[in-house]
């Protein structure tokens, strides 16, 4: 049956059940905290626009490969997070062409209309129950025809969600949330429901996934293959292995179980999350400012300048504790490890 979306908002309440697109299948209760951002501050010196509540329930779906959500309405505002194509958001407020949205992990930031579309609760529910496929290649393109030479409809990155229409040879015809259609190699897609069921997070799988991102640039607020900040990197790696983490490093530091840190690192296992920053002292509590994934033998992978592998304790320029890469905490989130 052909799936069709209507871009709309409804002023009526609905009993339709909206199932959030959680970025994985393992969720740690109590980890995710909602970050409510100021909605009525002027961004980057731009003229202040009136902020209005949006009639509820209101939803949206990202319609570009990576939609950039900013801390305040306006292009000059700081990047807060990113939303991948085909993923839904809850919509709360409006300021001009900008909408305050809430992502699956509770993060609130502002998306510009055009990078996402507004949909009713019923339309989002239909999308979530369509024949969805997830992109499994780091980067790919959707073309007008299955020939590899026609014009590009959109790019896509790993984790994007598309509706699968049909397969034609080695190509797959897909539909985007806004109704656009195109083709991409069938080899870069996997049935989303099957993909979620097949996630088996192991230490080797975590390492292999993390290494796919080596060399990708750092960008504050980024959590896509195009560019990632430290916690966006760890969130993506674990999402691709079926584990859902909160957005920020300080929130991730509350997930899983604590791991004792000793000079010989004997308690650490591959796949553990490492946290860096200011340790607790008489001057104040501990403050997490950076995170990475332990690989074993004193090595860890993280996004700083770019995604790369560092060695614990190696000297680096910058503030003492963080740049010497001495962790102040570690957490174990892989469920099968002791």
Segments (PLM) and residue ranges:
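Bacterial N-terminal signal peptides
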Residues: 16-30
């Amino acid at each position: 049956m052909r799936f069709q979306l209507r871009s709309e908002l409804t002023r009526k309440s609905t009993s339709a059940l909206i199932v959030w697109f959680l970025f994985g299948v393992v969720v740690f209760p109590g980890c995710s905290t909602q970050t409510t951002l100021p909605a009525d501050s002027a961004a980057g010196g731009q003229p202040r626009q009136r902020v209005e509540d949006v009639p509820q329930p209101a939803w949206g779906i990202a319609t570009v490969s990576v939609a950039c959500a900013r801390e305040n309405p306006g292009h000059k505002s700081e990047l807060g997070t990113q939303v991948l194509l085909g993923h839904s958001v809850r919509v709360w407020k409006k300021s001009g062409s900008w909408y305050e949205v809430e992502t699956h992990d509770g993060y609130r930031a502002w998306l510009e209309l055009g990078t996402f579309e507004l949909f009713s609760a019923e339309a989002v529910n239909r999308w979530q129950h369509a024949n969805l496929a997830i992109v499994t290649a780091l980067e790919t393109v959707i073309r007008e025809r299955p020939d590899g030479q026609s014009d590009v409809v959109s790019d896509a990155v790993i984790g994007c969600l598309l509706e699968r229409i049909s397969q034609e040879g080695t190509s797959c015809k897909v539909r985007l949330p806004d109704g656009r259609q195109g083709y991409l190699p069938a080899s870069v897609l996997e049935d989303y429901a099957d993909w979620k069921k097949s996630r088996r997070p192991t230490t080797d799988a975590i390492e292999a996934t993390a290494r796919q991102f080596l060399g990708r640039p750092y960008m504050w607020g980024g959590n896509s293959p195009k560019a990632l900040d430290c916690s966006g990197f760890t969130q993506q790696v674990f999402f691709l292995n079926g584990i859902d983490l909160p957005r920020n490093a300080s929130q991730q530091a509350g997930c899983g179980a604590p791991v004792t840190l000793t000079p010989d690192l004997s308690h650490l296992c591959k796949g553990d999350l490492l946290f860096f920053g200011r340790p607790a002292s008489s001057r104040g509590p501990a403050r997490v400012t950076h995170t990475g994934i332990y690989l074993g033998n004193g090595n860890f992978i993280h996004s700083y300048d770019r995604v790369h592998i560092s060695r614990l304790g190696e000297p680096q320029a910058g503030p003492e504790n963080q740049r010497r890469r001495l962790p102040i905490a570690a957490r174990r989130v892989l469920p099968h490890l002791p």
